[in-house]
Swiss-Prot record:
Residues the record lists as binding Mg(2+): 70, 88
Organism listed in the record: Corynebacterium efficiens (strain DSM 44549 / YS-314 / AJ 12310 / JCM 11189 / NBRC 100395)
Enzyme Commission (EC) number: 2.5.1.3, 2.7.1.49, 2.7.4.7
UniProt cross-references to InterPro entries, sorted A to Z: Aldolase_TIM, Haem_Oase-like_multi-hlx, HMP/HMP-P_kinase_dom, PM/HMP-P_kinase-1, Ribokinase-like, Thiaminase-2/PQQC, ThiamineP_synth_sf, ThiamineP_synth_TenI
Listed PANTHER family: HYDROXYMETHYLPYRIMIDINE_PHOSPHOMETHYLPYRIMIDINE KINASE THI20-RELATED (PTHR20858:SF17), PHOSPHOMETHYLPYRIMIDINE KINASE (PTHR20858)
Cofactor: Mg(2+)
Miscellaneous section: There is also a ThiE protein in this bacteria (AC Q8FP55).
Residues binding 4-amino-2-methyl-5-(diphosphooxymethyl)pyrimidine: 37-41, 69, 107, 143
Record protein name field: Thiamine biosynthesis multifunctional protein ThiED
Length: 739
């Protein structure tokens, strides 16, 4: 299906003249333009043909369709699509004149014009326009003779009718950044612009800005997602898994049943297919009442069912369609009749995205299963090009430490999604779940690459939680709500346990329920020993967190690590101020020097590590703004070091030394020269940092020894609060990016 998100109409009088049009178009396509229309009313036939050939070479190379403005002979010769206006050849005649495989777009200025062309096509038995340009939205200098503007509301009304008849639509006339967001909510399939890009200093940047606003405006708070698939009584696959996945991805799930499947975690024992008229009745009940923002197709089973669903998708309005070509269950059981493959190939031309596993991709291509991920991508390239549909390549069926995914576009370009393999035998329904989550994110307005990034990350955590579910005695399901529950726990506003308990009647702090491991860096005396003995619960939570486990084994995503490094750069700036304050308040010269030296190191040695990572080209942007978690921690440190007793401030800054050193030494056992985060592991297990930590422990011991009982208890509670802030600081990287 053609992506009409950003439709560029050229103008030879903008951007420096006709000779610059091809360069502007190429730049604009690189910025995100998805369709190009060559318009040059004044050019003679030969000149127009030359310009069309030049643009065709650019568009073909970059995988973007090219429409020609009302030049049928040139379009037929060069195999280009055509756009016509109300004053050009009547649409029915145009459709009969142009070869059927070429698209025709039509300008629509009023509702009467739209209803007339639909009626004319129905009477003549002619296919409806492939796309209609609705407008003008407002008056525009590029078409001074344009009819009266219809406004955003007029576009919305016509877009609803067009969508109901399966006609794509774009808003035209006076479209730009000022109204792109409003137009994105009208139901049109894209924005059609001229001067907004042709006259821009940077066409690529102008295209990116328009596309960003368009995509943001298209996002639905809770997309309505329809799954059309078979069932799984044990809940791990089929529509049961789809509905869980849709909910987890933020959608409202609806379901139409194609087959009642008797299956569990061991396999399939029977399939019952309801009558075809009942499938029609189910589909009618949904499409006649509810706007469908996305469709996920799963098990269709039989050739007639595949063709039946294909017919519905061709004639009813809906958002993006994601096809999971369910042919073989994880258990090895066949879920598609042998004669249905041809019908499925036809369906693949109708959908937006197809998500086969490795064996299914091989069947679709008529080849042997790919032995490697690279080979699978090449298979997908051939299939995507032949069918014109985006393919998701999934590495889960391969072997090795990686289970990467990829988006393969019809033009052959690839978007890779890194994904560490999860060691589990409980993977029932992963294909259903990934495609349903993908459909939901796309239904919310996210492009397929961002949608796959999200769905891959989500499914990886769902797989990591699968073993704990204990559903069935075979290959069990994934934990669809693992992320949801983790984020709910993180959002809990209940006061931290050590603050609710208060200080003990004897001693300065209560030991943790979880025994603290023997520290690699020993306490400097009884007070720091008591602090360490209270650390076990928090330290255990930190070591068990997904962030620290991924940091240790190298599977932490690049995005999560860079978020952490970015926030740590903000943290160190404020932490150095807290240390400098302690230097000014320290009771003796050695402590003053040590705190001051530590403050300087924060903004030199360690900050250099962060600048190195952030400037390696690994981050799209430099240091951003501090997160709420980072601000809470740094504000806490600044307040404790400035406003409380010296001993309290000293206790507050200690966990950043001691916990980091202990964690760094534990993770160092997994370090190796090829480790993606070897610099970080080297730094926090290195002799320099460890020596500084030993001195900090000694300074806190001395401060505690010189303080009174009440000060000691406040300092101990402050130390534990800082430990919890450390846990939150590490964990925040795995909480961002889920919206």
């Amino acid at each position: 299906m053609t992506d009409f998100s950003l439709y560029l109409v050229t103008d030879p009088h903008l951007g420096g003249g006709p000779e610059r049009v091809a360069g502007i178009v190429e730049d604009a396509i690189n910025g995100g333009v998805t369709v190009v229309q060559l318009r040059d009313k004044d050019a003679d036939e030969q000149t127009f043909r030359e310009h069309a050939m030049e643009l065709k070479r650019v568009c073909d190379r970059l995988g973007v369709p090219l429409f020609l403005n009302d030049r049928f002979a040139v379009a037929a010769e060069l195999s280009c699509h055509v756009h016509i206006g109300q004053g050009d050849l009547p649409y029915v005649q145009a459709r009969r004149q142009l070869p059927g495989h070429l698209m025709i777009g039509l300008t629509i200025e009023t509702m009467d014009q739209l209803e007339t062309v639909i009626a004319d096509c129905t009477r003549a038995g002619i296919a409806l326009p492939d796309v209609v340009g609705l407008g003008p939205v407002q008056a525009t200098d590029t078409k001074p003779d344009a009819p009266q503007a219809v406004g955003v509301d007029g576009v919305a009304a016509m877009a609803k009718v067009a969508r109901a008849h399966g006609i794509a639509s774009v808003a035209i006339g006076g479209v730009g950044l000022a109204n792109a967001a409003d137009l994105a909510r009208t139901g049109v399939d894209g924005l059609c612009v001229v001067s907004a890009i042709m006259a821009a200093p940077s066409p690529a940047e102008a295209a990116r800005e328009l596309l960003d606003v368009w995509e943001a405006g298209r996002r639905v708070a809770q997309p309505r997602v329809l799954t059309i698939a078979g069932t799984d009584p044990t809940g791990g696959a089929g529509v049961q898994a789809d509905l869980k996945s849709i909910a987890a991805a933020g959608g409202f799930g609806m379901s139409v049943i194609t087959a009642l499947v008797a299956q569990n975690t061991h396999g399939v024992t029977g399939v019952h297919t309801p009558p075809a008229d009942f499938l029609d009745e189910q589909l009618e009940s949904v499409f006649s009442d509810v706007t469908v923002d996305a469709v996920k197709l799963g098990m269709l089973g039989r050739a007639d069912t595949v063709r039946q669903v294909t017919g519905w998708l061709r004639t009813r309005p809906h958002g993006p369609v994601i096809l999971d070509p369910v042919m073989v269950a994880t258990s090895g059981d066949s879920l598609l009749d042998p004669d249905a493959t041809e019908a499925l190939l036809e369906l693949a031309t109708v959908v937006d995205v197809i998500t086969p596993n490795i064996p299914e991709l091989a069947v679709l291509c008529g080849e042997q299963p790919a032995p490697s991920f690279d080979a699978a991508i090449e298979q997908a390239r051939r299939f995507a090009t032949d069918v014109g549909t985006t393919v998701i390549v999934k590495g889960g069926h391969l072997t090795g430490p990686r289970a990467d995914n990829a988006v393969v576009y019809p033009d052959g370009s690839v978007h890779m999604v890194a994904n560490p393999r999860v060691d589990t035998t409980n993977s029932h329904g992963t294909g259903c779940s990934l495609s349903a989550a993908l459909a939901t994110r796309m239904g919310a307005g996210h492009p397929v690459d961002k949608a796959l990034d999200w769905a891959t990350r989500w499914l990886n955590e769902a797989l990591r939680g699968a073993d704990a579910l204990q559903v069935g005695s075979g290959s069990g399901p994934v934990d669809h709500f693992a992320v949801t529950r983790r984020l709910l726990r993180a959002a809990d506003a209940t006061p931290w346990p050590h603050l609710r308990m208060g200080a003990p009647s004897d001693g300065i702090i209560t030991p943790s329920d979880t025994q603290s491991p023997a520290p690699a860096l020993a306490p400097a005396g009884p007070y720091t020993r008591a602090l360490w003995e209270a650390t076990g619960d928090v330290l255990g939570e930190i070591l068990d967190s997904g962030f620290i486990r991924g940091l240790g084994d190298g599977t932490l995503s690049r995005e999560e690590f860079l978020f952490y490094i970015d926030q740590d750069a903000h943290y160190l700036r404020q932490y150095s101020r807290a240390l400098a304050t302690l230097s000014s308040r320290a009771p003796d010269a050695p402590a003053q020097v040590d705190w001051a030296t530590s403050a300087a190191e924060c903004i030199t040695v360690e900050a250099e590590l962060h600048r190195t990572y952030l400037n390696k080209g690994l981050a799209e942007t430099g240091v951003s703004a501090p997160s709420p978690v980072t601000m809470a921690y740094t504000d806490f440190l600044i307040a404790r070091s400035h406003a409380d007793d010296y001993v309290v401030g000293a206790a507050a800054v200690l966990p950043c030394y001691w916990l980091y050193a202990e964690i760094g030494l534990i993770l160092a056992k997994q370090n190796h020269p090829e480790h993606p985060y070897t610099d970080w592991l080297d730094t926090y297990s290195g002799e320099g940092f460890l020596a500084g930590t030993v001195k900090a422990i000694a300074r806190v011991e001395a401060a505690m020894a010189g303080a009174g009982p009440d000060q000691q208890r406040v300092a101990a509670q402050t130390y534990l609060s800082a430990c919890v802030h450390e846990r939150e600081f590490f964990d925040q990287a795995t909480r961002q990016g889920w919206n």
